[in-house]
């Protein structure tokens, strides 16, 4: 495996920590007036999502993870596994619930996703930033409700629950931001 010095560590870089891949989310190079320089960094484990902060000497090295982000298309779920296909090579991979990382509640089929592969196996799935899903269940809007007032929970066709404005009704299609899980717009 390749190693990188602390001077070359950047945000978004994927490293190995205790034989588990992680993504660096923050780095700060500190040179105190007295003593040795050091780098303070935060990283998030890709599999578990756990965030850890670590301080390392400027002379230390970190191991770069052999992790590849691949554009793939979600095909279907058989209940136990979720199946993805590379649109260029038509190669298919499957992942379990742990590898989905919560993306399963936004996918219904034929969406383009970014699948993170480690040693050829998927360990993380990033859904598209926005998805359009149909509301299967929500309370009806009451006359006098305004768009500026509160909201109500709505169950989507994938089973996800999001808060929507009071004017949105059942069987309408809405646009949802998958990064925050929030309602974005109503689709006409």
Curated annotation (Swiss-Prot):
Keyword line: Cytoplasm, Elongation factor, Hydroxylation, Protein biosynthesis
Pathways involved: Protein biosynthesis; polypeptide chain elongation
MF annotations from Gene Ontology: translation elongation factor activity
Signal peptide: none
InterPro entries xref list: Elong-fact-P_C, NA-bd_OB-fold, Rib_uL2_dom2, Transl_elong_fac_P/YeiP, Transl_elong_KOW-like, Transl_elong_P/YeiP_cen, Transl_elong_P/YeiP_CS, Transl_elongation_fac_P
One Pfam family matching this protein: Elong-fact-P_C
One GO term describing the cellular component: cytoplasm
Record-linked Gene3D superfamilies: 2.30.30.30, Nucleic acid-binding proteins (2.40.50.140)
Positions of modified residues (N6-(3,6-diaminohexanoyl)-5-hydroxylysine): 34
Subcellular location: Cytoplasm
Biological processes per GO annotation: peptide biosynthetic process
Processing after translation: May be beta-lysylated on the epsilon-amino group of Lys-34 by the combined action of EpmA and EpmB, and then hydroxylated on the C5 position of the same residue by EpmC (if this protein is present). Lysylation is critical for the stimulatory effect of EF-P on peptide-bond formation. The lysylation moiety may extend toward the peptidyltransferase center and stabilize the terminal 3-CCA end of the tRNA. Hydroxylation of the C5 position on Lys-34 may allow additional potential stabilizing hydrogen-bond interactions with the P-tRNA.
Superkingdom assignment: Bacteria
Described purpose of this protein according to its UniProt entry: Involved in peptide bond synthesis. Alleviates ribosome stalling that occurs when 3 or more consecutive Pro residues or the sequence PPG is present in a protein, possibly by augmenting the peptidyl transferase activity of the ribosome. Modification of Lys-34 is required for alleviation.
NCBIfam families registered for this protein in UniProt: efp, PRK00529.1
Family recorded in the similarity comment: Belongs to the elongation factor P family.
PANTHER family: ELONGATION FACTOR P, ELONGATION FACTOR P (EF-P) FAMILY PROTEIN
The protein, known as: Elongation factor P
Organism: Xanthomonas oryzae pv. oryzae (strain MAFF 311018)
């Amino acid at each position: 495996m390749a190693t990188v010095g602390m001077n070359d560590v950047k945000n978004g870089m994927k490293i190995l920590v205790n034989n588990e891949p992680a993504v660096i989310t923050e780095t700060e190079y500190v040179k105190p007036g007295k003593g040795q320089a050091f780098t303070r960094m935060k990283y998030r484990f890709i599999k578990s999502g756990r965030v850890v902060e670590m301080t390392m000497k400027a002379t230390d090295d970190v191991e770069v993870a052999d992790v590849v982000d691949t554009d793939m298309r979600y095909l279907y779920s058989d209940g136990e596994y979720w199946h993805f296909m590379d649109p260029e090579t038509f190669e298919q991979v499957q992942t379990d619930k742990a590898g989905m990382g919560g993306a399963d509640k936004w996918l219904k089929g034929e969406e383009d996703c970014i699948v993170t592969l480690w040693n050829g196996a998927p360990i993380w799935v990033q859904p598209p930033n926005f998805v359009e899903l149909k509301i299967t269940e929500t309370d009806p809007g009451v006359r006098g409700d305004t768009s500026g007032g509160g909201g109500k929970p709505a169950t989507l066709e994938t089973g996800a629950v999001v808060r929507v404005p009071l004017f949105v009704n059942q069987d309408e299609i809405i646009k949802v931001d998958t990064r925050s899980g929030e309602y974005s717009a109503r689709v006409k």
